[in-house]
Structures are given as C-alpha cells and as structure tokens.
From Swiss-Prot:
Protein family (similarity comment): Belongs to the ATPase A chain family.
Lipid bilayer topology: Multi-pass membrane protein
Subunit structure: F-type ATPases have 2 components, CF(1) - the catalytic core - and CF(0) - the membrane proton channel. CF(1) has five subunits: alpha(3), beta(3), gamma(1), delta(1), epsilon(1). CF(0) has three main subunits: a(1), b(2) and c(9-12). The alpha and beta chains form an alternating ring which encloses part of the gamma chain. CF(1) is attached to CF(0) by a central stalk formed by the gamma and epsilon chains, while a peripheral stalk is formed by the delta and b chains.
Protein's name in the database: ATP synthase subunit a
Record flagged with keyword Ion transport: yes
First-listed, main subcellular location of the protein, grouped into a coarse class: membrane
Keywords tagged on the record: ATP synthesis, Cell inner membrane, Cell membrane, CF(0), Hydrogen ion transport, Ion transport, Membrane, Transmembrane, Transmembrane helix, Transport
Pfam family membership, one: ATP-synt_A
The keyword Phosphoprotein appears for this protein: no
Function: Key component of the proton channel; it plays a direct role in the translocation of protons across the membrane.
Subcellular location: Cell inner membrane
GO molecular function, one term: proton-transporting ATP synthase activity, rotational mechanism
Length: 241
C-alpha cells in the first residue's frame, strides 16, 4: 500500500513500490516452498506435524471439489487448486503481520491469477470437447435463443476475470487498510480481536477463490451433463413453434 511502512520497503525504499511488491511475492513463494518441503521431507504411514496438516488440507480441497465436480476430477485438478489456494492464503495472511504487505491487496497480483484460471478452464474445456463443441454450448440448448445467449455467455465468462480479481483484491485491500487504521488509533493490544477476524477473512477469500476454480472447471468440462439436464419439454415446445 502506498504510504504504509513495510520492513521490505524500508530496505528497498518505499518509493520503489514495484520492487516492494516483488519482494513480498518472493517472500510468499519462499514460505510456500518451505511448507511443501517440510510436509514432504519424510513421509510416514502415520503422518505427524506438517505432513499431517498438509494431508488434512489436501483432503479438504478434494472434499470441497468432490461436491462440485466429482471426486475423480477433483483429484485431477487438485495440484492447481491446492497450490493456488496455499499461495493466496499465505499472501492474505502475511499482510496481517504489521510491517508486511499482502501481495493480494494489489490488482497486479490478483488479475494475473484470475487470467490464469480463465485461460486454464477454457483450455480444459476445449481439450475435452473440441473448439466447435465447446463454444457451441455457449449458445444454450434452445437454438432459437442462440443469437441472444451466445453474446451473453461470452460477456459472462469475460466478467469472471473481473469478479475473481477484484473480489480478492478489494477484500484484502480493505482488510489491510482496516488494520492499518486500527493500529494508528489503538496500537498493539486493542487490534488483537481484529487479527482473528482478518485471519478468518483471509481464509474465507481463499476458500471462495478455490471453490470458484472448481465451479468454472465443472462448467467447462461437464458440458454434456449440463445439456442432459436441460428440460426436454421446453426444447420440444420451441421446436414445434
């Protein structure tokens, strides 16, 4: 955030905001890699310590995705969703520590994340169904409404980039500003309850981003299932007209 002291900003210079952002991104990357290394350093049949936490996390991600896309596909996309979730959570939480900045409070971080998800789920949909079949489902099951539905679906999919990036950016930016103001008014002791609230908010925003990845992937790869669920009587009626 502009004008807010950070330890890395003190080292690199507060004016070089891009360098400070990159430094915080590298710090988050190092933390994520360290967590992964600690969890995989020595596998045990009965997990303990970091391995236990990581296995619980991965199991929770699969359980979350299973309700959306099925267990097989939830496991297939587990590496992407779990990695993105861990990165976002660490990025969110690090800003709660005074003197550090959440990389996810910057649109230059959340927008590339949203673009990555957008490109990936469309790629998966095209890979499974082919270009023609994939984009044909944008027109919907009712052919007469295709000229109306196709542009609406295109706009709807493009708007996901904005909703994913700005939801995460706006919430984390607001949390950081809230904590900053609170620390200015009543430093150290009084903000302690706020830390719990902000940690919950960081967890919630991570969950929302992860579940939306599964939702978008489900919509891209489960086209046939969607069409099968379309009400047949409505299609027959329109065809008769």
């Amino acid at each position: 955030m502009e004008g807010v002291f950070t330890y890395l900003g003190g080292i690199l210079g507060e004016d070089s905001h891009s360098a400070v952002l990159i430094a915080h991104l590298l710090l988050v990357a190092v933390i994520v890699i360290m967590i992964a290394k600690m969890a995989t350093k020595s596998f045990r049949a009965v997990p303990n310590g970091t391995q236990n936490v990581m296995e619980a996390y991965l199991g929770g991600v699969v359980a979350m995705g299973k309700d959306v896309i099925g267990e097989e596909l939830a496991r297939k996309y587990l590496p992407l969703v779990a990695a993105v979730g861990l990165f976002i959570f660490v990025s969110n939480v690090i800003g709660i520590i005074p003197g550090f900045e959440s990389p996810t409070s910057n649109i230059n971080v959340t927008l590339p994340l949203a673009l990555m998800v957008f490109v990936y789920y469309n790629y998966e949909g095209i890979k499974k169904h082919g270009v023609v079949h994939y984009f044909a489902h944008f027109a919907g099951p009712v052919k007469l409404l295709a000229p109306l539905m196709f542009p609406i679906e295109i706009v709807s999919h493009l708007s996901r980039i904005i909703s994913l990036s700005f939801r995460l950016f706006g919430n984390i930016k607001g949390d950081d500003l809230f904590l900053w103001v609170l620390l200015m008014l009543v430093p150290f002791v009084a903000p302690l309850p706020a830390y719990l609230l902000l940690t919950f908010s960081a967890l919630l925003q991570t969950f929302v981003f992860m579940i939306l990845i599964y939702v978008y992937l489900a919509g891209a790869v489960a086209i046939d299932e969607e069409h099968e669920k379309a009400p047949a009587p409505a299609i027959d009626t329109m065809g008769a007209v």
